[in-house]
Regions:
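Hydrophobic alpha-helical segments and helix pairs
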Residues: 16-24
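Short secondary-structure junctions and interdomain/linker hinges
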Residues: 13-16, 62
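Short, charged surface segments at domain edges that flank catalytic/cofactor-binding sites
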Residues: 25-79, 91-101, 152-156
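Generic structural hydrophobic/aromatic packing signal, biased to beta-strands
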Residues: 6, 38-39, 84
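A detector for short metal-coordination/catalytic motifs
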Residues: 79-84, 88-157
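Hydrophobic/aromatic-lined pockets within catalytic cores
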Residues: 11-14, 67, 71, 118
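Non-catalytic DNA-binding core/recognition domains of DNA-processing enzymes
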Residues: 1-13
Length: 157
């Protein structure tokens, strides 16, 4: 008896089915009190902003996945906006005896490729991950980060 209402609520709570509700969303434009603040403590490994900026500059402000990718001009550099990405994420530092914050591990990516690596589906990421591994494996080894392709893939998924 209540299953239709419950199913609609579950879809709503999961954010599904909003694509066709655009014109009806104004119904939910109401005042909402400010939520209480909460403290979040997060331990992260230090990253060198110098390594990141020099990696982007040494790539000529071009995406290392596809140099034809274009982006907007960044106001602080006057150059195409690019992002530094650790191929092996810094959160994995505990698994390695040498620092992951090295030039060989920081790649210059356009925002789209960067978001693909963080939020994309595996099938779309595969070729990008392969390219990164083959482009960087030798340089990583020189930095004391010796890693096979299978291990690399498993760590960054």
């Amino acid at each position: 008896m209540y299953s239709a209402g419950l199913n609609n609520y579950i879809r709503f709570a999961n954010g599904k089915g909003f694509g066709n509700l655009h014109n009806h969303m104004q119904i939910m434009d109401v005042e909402i009190p400010v939520a209480d603040k909460h403290i979040v403590v997060n331990n992260t490994w230090r990253r060198s902003s110098i390594i990141k900026m020099q990696s982007i500059e040494s790539a000529g402000y071009r995406c290392e996945i596809n140099q034809k990718h274009e982006t907007f001009t960044a106001k602080n550099t006057g150059k195409p906006y690019m992002e530094g990405h650790h191929a092996l994420p810094m959160k994995l530092q505990d698994k390695f005896i040498n620092s992951l914050d090295v030039y060989a591990n920081v790649i210059c990516l356009c925002p789209t490729c960067h978001r693909l690596l963080h939020y994309g589906v595996e099938s779309e990421k595969k070729n990008v991950i392969d390219k990164i591994y083959y482009d960087r494996a030798d340089r990583l080894a020189v930095c004391g980060i010796k890693i096979g392709k299978k291990e690399f893939e498993s760590l960054i998924k």
